[in-house]
C-alpha cells in the first residue's frame, strides 16, 4: 500500500461521504465504480463486497444523528430491517453467482435509473399518524422489505433511494422520518451483504477501513455545507443526478466492452 493509493482510497471515500452528507442520499451508489475505476480494485465482486462495508458503517453513523433528533420510527424501522435481511442475504448470494461484468452491466442500468430519479426529485408524502393497525402495517412493511433487501444485497448498495419510498408507501410516514428510519435497514442490509461476501473472501478489509475514514471525513464536511446550501438542495440533487448518469454510461460501456471482447 503506497501513500498515493492511500490518498486515492481515502479521497474516494470522502467523495461518497461528502455526497451523502450534502444531499442526504444517493451518494453510496458511486462507491463501487470508484473502487473499480479509481482505487483500482480489479474484481467486481470484491468491489461490491468492500463497498457494502462502507455503506453499512456510514448508515449506522448517520442513524445515531437522526435518532437523536427523533426522526426514527423504531417499530417500522426494526420490522423493515429484520424482515429485509432475508432478502439481503438471498440477493447477495445470487449476486455472487453472476459473472462480475454482467453484474456490473446491471449495476450500470440501476445507476442510470437512480440518476433519473434524482433528476425528478424526491417524492413526498402527506403527514400521517405513526400508530396504524399493527397487522396491516407489518404485512405491508414486510413485503416491500424483502424486495428492497434483495435489491440492496444483489447490488451491494445502501438502497436508501428504494427504502425511503418503500417506507412511505408501507406506513405513510413523513419523508424526514422515512429517511431516518431507512438508515437502520441500510446499515443492516449492508452488514448482511458484507458478512455474506466475507464468507467467500470477497471483502478487502484494508481498503474498506480507508474508505470509511474518508467517508466519515467527507460526510462531516457535507453535513456542514448542507445547511448553507439548503436553498439549492433541488439543484444540487439534479446536478448529482447528471453525474450519476454519466458514471452509469461509463460503467455500462466498460462492462459491455468486456463482455463482447
Curated annotation (Swiss-Prot):
It comes from the Bacteria. Induction: Repressed by BigR. It is a multi-pass membrane protein. One of its GO terms (cellular component) is plasma membrane. Keywords: Cell membrane, Membrane, Transmembrane, Transmembrane helix, Transport. Belongs to the 4-toluene sulfonate uptake permease (TSUP) (TC 2.A.102) family. This is Probable membrane transporter protein XF_0764. It comes from Xylella fastidiosa (strain 9a5c).
Amino acid at each position: 500500500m503506497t501513500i498515493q493509493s492511500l490518498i486515492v482510497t481515502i479521497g474516494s471515500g470522502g467523495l461518497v461521504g461528502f455526497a451523502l452528507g450534502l444531499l442526504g442520499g444517493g451518494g453510496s451508489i458511486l462507491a463501487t465504480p470508484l473502487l473499480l475505476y479509481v482505487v483500482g480494485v480489479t474484481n467486481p465482486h470484491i468491489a461490491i463486497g468492500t463497498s457494502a462495508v462502507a455503506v453499512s458503517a456510514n448508515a449506522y453513523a448517520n442513524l445515531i444523528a437522526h435518532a437523536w433528533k427523533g426522526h426514527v420510527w423504531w417499530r417500522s424501522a426494526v420490522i423493515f430491517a429484520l424482515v429485509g435481511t432475508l432478502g439481503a442475504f438471498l440477493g447477495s448470494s445470487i449476486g455472487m453467482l453472476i459473472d462480475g461484468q454482467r453484474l456490473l452491466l446491471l449495476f450500470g442500468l440501476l445507476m442510470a435509473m437512480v440518476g433519473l430519479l434524482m433528476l425528478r426529485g424526491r417524492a413526498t408524502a402527506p403527514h400521517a399518524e405513526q400508530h396504524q393497525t399493527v397487522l396491516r402495517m407489518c404485512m405491508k412493511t414486510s413485503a416491500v422489505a424483502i424486495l428492497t433487501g434483495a435489491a440492496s444485497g444483489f447490488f451491494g448498495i445502501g438502497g436508501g433511494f428504494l427504502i425511503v419510498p418503500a417506507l412511505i408507501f408501507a406506513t405513510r410516514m413523513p419523508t424526514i422520518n422515512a429517511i431516518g428510519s431507512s438508515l437502520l435497514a441500510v446499515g443492516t442490509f449492508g452488514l448482511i451483504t458484507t458478512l455474506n461476501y466475507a464468507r467467500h473472501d470477497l471483502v478487502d478489509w484494508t481498503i474498506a477501513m480507508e474508505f470509511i475514514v474518508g467517508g466519515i471525513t467527507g460526510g462531516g464536511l457535507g453535513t456542514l455545507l448542507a445547511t448553507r446550501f439548503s436553498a439549492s438542495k433541488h439543484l444540487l440533487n439534479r446536478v448529482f443526478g447528471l453525474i450519476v448518469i454519466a458514471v452509469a454510461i461509463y460503467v455500462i460501456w466498460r462492462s459491455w466492452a468486456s463482455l463482447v471482447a
